[in-house]
Every structure is written in structure tokens, then in C-alpha cells.
A protein has these predicted regions:
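Short beta->alpha junction loops
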Residues: 2-4, 179-184
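Conserved thiamine diphosphate
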Residues: 3-7, 13-151, 158-161, 176
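Redox- and metal-dependent alpha/beta enzyme cores, enriched for Fe-S-associated oxidoreductases
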Residues: 154-175, 179-182
Length: 184
């Protein structure tokens, strides 16, 4: 496969339509724009167009959403959410959560976009003993911290940023509830 995002997506869709479970990687979130038309027109609406007669369980993996380099400074999340109605859009806060999403996606027939946290690749994480089996449910926010003064709702790479802000607020006597929505 060449380094042409539309080709990567198109070949992944073709493989998925033939019964395989491909995982197509788009190097950075900003590059997804080059594949958005084929993902929107050919994948996201496939079940709707065929009255659930066809499925293409393609998993598109990318990284980004925050802390990108000078050439990857955008965050096209609103654009992505609007264009990919019909696909799961998952934004794990760390790589353990990402593994849970991938495990789930390998068991279901929904196409999905997983946006891995670029600021989490080199972090040490506590791993579950069943790393190859555990799943993270889609559409279920997780309350990471209980609080009484402020509720902070975030996702993906911004969870770590929010946790740092919480520490500063706690020093001022402000109790913060932190919710990770995980899927958009």
C-alpha cells in the first residue's frame, strides 16, 4: 500500500467487504482529511445504504488530537464527527484503553476510527492481566474522579491535561469531577 490516505482507506474497505478484518493506519489525524471522502461516502453510510445488507468492519487507526507538531497543528474533530456518521469514533486516553477498544472492535461488525493519544505512547501504564481479552464498552463515559464543585468532561489526549489542571485546582480547595467520554 502506498502512502496515499485515500488508497489506504479504499483498500481497507475492499478487504473488509470481502470478509477480512483490516486495520488501516493513517499516520496522523490531520492526514485523515485526505481519506475523508471515501470513508464518508463508501464506509460510514454502507449499512444505511444497504439496509444492513452489507458490512465492512474496517478499523482505521490514527494518532493525534493534541500535541501535534508544526505541520499537524489542527484538530479537525468536528469535521470528522460530521463526516463519519455511521462509524464509531473512539478516543482512548491511553494505550491500555486503546487495546480495550481494539479488542472490542475485532468482535463487532461496525467500522470505526480510533484516535490514539499521541502524548501517551511512551508512558508506563498499569496493564490488566487479561490485556488480550478485555474490552472497553462504546458509548459509556467513565468517571475517573469524583468531585463536588466542578464537573470536567473531556476525552483522549486532553484527559492528562485535565488531570494536571485538577491537581492545581485541588490546591485551591476546588473539588473536580473528571469524566472521560471515550467515544464520540
Amino acid at each position: 500500500v502506498g502512502i496515499r490516505e485515500a488508497t489506504i482507506a479504499g483498500q481497507g474497505i475492499g478487504m473488509a467487504l470481502r470478509g477480512l478484518r483490516p486495520l488501516a493506519e493513517i499516520q496522523y489525524l490531520d492526514y485523515l482529511a485526505y481519506a475523508i471522502q471515501i470513508l464518508s461516502d463508501d464506509l460510514a453510510c454502507l449499512r444505511y445504504r444497504t439496509k444492513a445488507g452489507q458490512k465492512a468492519p474496517l478499523i482505521v487507526s490514527t494518532r493525534g488530537h493534541r500535541l501535534e507538531g508544526i505541520w499537524h497543528s489542527g484538530s479537525p474533530m468536528q469535521f470528522i464527527l460530521g463526516a463519519l456518521r455511521g462509524m464509531l469514533v473512539l478516543v482512548p486516553r491511553n494505550m491500555t484503553q486503546a487495546a480495550g477498544f481494539y479488542n472490542l472492535l475485532l468482535q463487532c461488525d461496525d467500522p470505526a476510527l480510533v484516535i490514539e493519544p499521541l502524548n501517551g505512547y511512551r508512558l508506563k501504564e498499569k496493564l490488566p492481566e487479561n490485556l488480550g481479552d478485555f474490552t472497553i464498552p462504546v458509548g459509556v463515559p467513565e468517571i475517573l474522579d469524583e468531585g463536588t464543585d466542578v464537573t470536567l468532561v473531556t476525552y483522549g489526549s486532553c484527559v492528562r491535561v485535565a488531570q494536571d489542571a485538577m491537581k492545581q485546582l485541588q490546591q485551591c480547595g476546588i473539588s473536580v469531577e473528571l469524566i472521560d467520554v471515550q467515544s464520540l
